[in-house]
Amino acid sequence: MLYLIKLGKPGWLMWTNLVLTVYFSLVVCLLWRAFRLQLKVNLYSYDTIFYFGFALFILSLAGTYVYITFHCFQNPQSFREAQTIYTLLHSAKNYMLLTAPFLLLFAASLFISNIMLIRHEGFRFVNVLGIILSFLLIAGQVLIDFLDYRAAVYGQQSLWENLLINLLAAFYLYFECMIIGSAVADVIAAKNEAEKDRDFLIILGCALKKDGTPTPLLRGRLDLALQFRNAQLEESGKEACFVVSGGQGADEVQSEAASMQAYLLEQGIPHGQILAENRSVNTLENMLFSKEIIDGVRKNGKVAFFTTNYHVFRAGLKAEQAGLDAVGMGAPTKWYFWPNAAVREYVGLLTEHRRKQAIILFTVAVIYSALTFLAYT
């Protein structure tokens, strides 16, 4: 259809704009419906991020074509076929421009929180991930704007220059959509709350103090699990069994499970109500080994897991991988700690789904390459 517009077929311009408006509007509705369904069926999924992130982008396209179609029907002579094609071709750049205020605010927040994190926690590579991401986000926008400015000053862009800019914009579009989708999924997952009918409460371990006692971060997870257990006991009268999960690091005097078990005992939880999993060295093993213990006690028990707010979504993904049906809850952390930790989780999420992302990026690259060549034919 776009090729027929390019050939100048009479009457096709208005109707193609209308078809594109309807098409993109339907895609937005389908993506939003899929996102809502995903929240009910399986919140902890890469698809949750994808559906929301790209729904916003397609919504911007649908809105643009609503505007074009309305004015095209009002004054057909004022519109040319190039506007329809170039709206699609420059959609990635236009979306970056539309979301630039959000990106600027997001990057500034990451930068400030990282500076505070370094002041409190010291300089380590993992503590500057937010600064690196902030720089990349701003640098991408500046680079694309510079290339467009250069073309405006020195004349029309060549096919290959335009292709390079559009592919760069498409690359940034993808990761921007994933950042937005990931941020929304993280917030929803962190605010999620399990029903007060759980049989098992898994508490995910993390680094201990030098003396082997829980750090404030780990105490936050333990206290949240205790609060939930007490609230459930009061509301439904149902007692839950704690599963403390975490092995022993090379620099730790005891396993994280042993440290958590001692803390729960100090809070008055009976020894027989605590199951210890002390072999795991990562989140996936936390879930796998905890599931083994739970299945040995009671098959198909209702499970909740407790971690820190920034880690709930990715921990939920690991639970899905382990075949564990569980609802996650997140303990609060210091304001300057969450953004950088969320970036670390985001990077981890991307590296774990390389094949799926490669397919999506390749598809996006093919689409924008085809549109670029079409615009120059």
Where are these regions (language model features)?
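A structural signal for short, hydrophobic/glycine-enriched beta-strand patches
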Residues: 169, 183-341
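Extended hydrophobic blocks
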Residues: 1-195, 296-302, 306-377
